[in-house]
Amino acid sequence: DHNHDGFRDLPKSDQINVANKWLYAADNGTQVRWGWKFVQENRLGGMLDYKNTRTMREAMEKDWDWRAGDKKMPLYGSHIRNRNANGYFKVGMPVGPAVYDPDEQDEMRSNLAFVADFDHFSEDAYFGLNDYRGNENTLSLNLMYNHYFTYRSSLIVGVQGHLDYYREKLLNPTPWIAANSVRNYDFDRNEREAGAYAEYTYAIKDKFSI
């Protein structure tokens, strides 16, 4: 509280991170990667003495009009809890013969790859009298083929799909407006995308590529 206004300049926060990754590499060049991670974060904001307790939350709701009722001003606060879970699976497989470049003394090989990724994010928060709850589930799928005509000439083609599943609600009580004491905002929606792509690359040594 550098400006001494009784409010935290930055939220008080704590975070937990857990992750696990695996890699399997076969003798033929095939690689399989998979893993997951989990993150949880809590952020407490508002006045310096505010704590995330039921008693203090109820005091904010009950005594919002503390001046008119000649009551003690309740402590204002906010709290955010974020949770994120992610899992992924990737497999890459070489296909066809390799193409060799005698100048580079190296070879390239065409390959087929598949990637699946799932992400879940949830937020449970309140800011004074306003409550927000949101969940997002995202699934991404990508199938890609990379073909080498020569060491410096290649074509990538692929298809991909993307699904977003949103569930969001904002509870916005305004007790000082009798006709609109409680208002709920619903932002639920689903978004889907699918597409295909192609990319050709030609490289002149390490100096230029198109």
Could you say what each language-model-derived stretch is?
Residues 1-210:
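Outer-membrane beta-barrel proteins, especially TonB-dependent receptors
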